[in-house]
Amino acid sequence: MECLRYLPRLLPRAAQSRSALCMAAVRLSLAACCGRATPLTSGSQKAPSTPRTAGDVYRFRTSDASQATLASVAQVFAVTKFDKEGNVTSFERKKTELYHELALQARDLRFQHVMSITTRNNRIIMRMEYLKAVITPEYLLILDYRNLNLEHWLFRELPSQLAGEGQLVTYPLPFEFRAIEALLQYWINTLQGKLSILQPLILETLDALVDPKHSSVDRSKLHVLLQNGKSLSELETDIKIFKESILELLDEEEMLEELCLTKWSDPHVFEQSSTGIDHAEEMELLLENYYRLADDLSNEARELRVLIDDSQSIIFINLDSHRNVMMRLNLQLTMGTFSLSLFGLMGVAFGMNLESSLEEDHRVFWLITGIMFMGSGLIWRRLLSFLGRQLEAPLPPVMASLPKKTLLADRRMDVKNSLRPEGLGAGRTILASR
């Protein structure tokens, strides 16, 4: 009877193996003999009210693992903080913690664009390709500077510039002006450095390719020029994107006002901007200055591109001239072969098995051979002269000269037309006086 009492607990486990059911029955029978009931599960765990299948357990474990993985791989920024005095602090922050501290949204720290300057909640967010920065009225944050070779600029040049010890022109203005100018100056110097590296390489390669001393074109030089041309195209794209980003800011007056962070956070600076120095105009002048610098770089890159295109035209002309020389030589050899074949028919005629009295004379061989070579040479010279006349450049068309009488008549008419108003005016005044 004790076994029948615990039988309903065994029914949900009917899917288990036969050996497991037998072991459970033996345990129940032993417990009944001892006068106490032993639960199927351990005392520390409570048996579930409904049976759990293997699929449910697998899904539960998968969700836990995915959550743990997401928590472990959360994006962490290596942050470098610069304050107004030039003090530098480096630390690490998770992305969620960072945008909560800066009062920004998660989308503001994605940095998806190649070049962008935006404002969010009295913060300036700048990205110039690999350089990511957040500017506030009190400090500057540089994000993810590792493996970018920025240590020299970050820890030696930038702190002194922000503290007012460098060569920036925005020292009397608030902190965000110095930060923006320092970042723009760094990026312009980077573009200028790329151009200064490419320019001598391209000019040296072009000089070697266009040199008239070399009759053939070196393929290795062409490969180097191709690689430098690709690098120049990338540089032109970077300069163009930089100019477009600056131009977008210059076209929007509201954006220029929003870039002046201290103006909206400090009442004293706001009064000073409204009565004395207009910070929006200063920001516009700053951006216009760097737009002109980028425009100068764009012009230099365009000049290099024009040189490459002109050199390419010269190279094609040289290749065409070499090709024409080879074609002309081939044509001359073809005409020579035709001439020899034409007068070689005489030798073919004597090579037939025909009897004639000419074969008995030994001088006839040399006579026929001489006639063959002389005739072939004459025909070849005639063909060459015909080819030369056909390949001569055509003369420019001669303009028909006008007769001298027509020119003199036209000059007289011009003189009369120029003197007619004055003569009429003078005659009228004389008649009026009379």
UniProtKB/Swiss-Prot annotation:
Topology, Mitochondrial matrix side: 54-330, 393-434
Record entry for activity regulation: May be regulated by calcium ions.
Transit peptide feature range: 1-28
Membrane-topology descriptor: Multi-pass membrane protein
Keywords from the named record: Ion transport, Magnesium, Membrane, Metal-binding, Mitochondrion, Mitochondrion inner membrane, Transit peptide, Transmembrane, Transmembrane helix, Transport
Gene3D superfamilies referenced in this protein's UniProt entry, alphabetically: 2.40.128.330, Magnesium transport protein CorA, transmembrane region (1.20.58.340)
One of the GO BP terms on file: mitochondrial magnesium ion transmembrane transport
GO MF annotation, one: magnesium ion transmembrane transporter activity
Cell location: Mitochondrion inner membrane
Mitochondrial intermembrane side: 351-361
Transmembrane segment boundaries: 331-350, 362-392
Motif GMN motif per record, residues: 351-353
InterPro entries: MRS2-like
Binding site for Mg(2+) 1: E234, T237, D238, E303
Kinase among keywords: no
Binding of Mg(2+) 2, residues: D320
List of residues binding Mg(2+) 3d: G351, N353
Any single GO CC term annotated in Swiss-Prot or TrEMBL for this entry: mitochondrion
Family to which this protein belongs: Belongs to the CorA metal ion transporter (MIT) (TC 1.A.35) family.
Quaternary structure, from the entry: Homopentamer.
Protein purpose: Magnesium transporter that mediates the influx of magnesium into the mitochondrial matrix and regulates magnesium metabolism. Also permeable to calcium, sodium and potassium ions. Required for normal expression of the mitochondrial respiratory complex I subunits. May play a role in maintaining the inner mitochondrial membrane potential.
Swiss-Prot/TrEMBL domain comment: The GMN motif acts as an ion selectivity filter.
Name this polypeptide is given: Magnesium transporter MRS2 homolog, mitochondrial
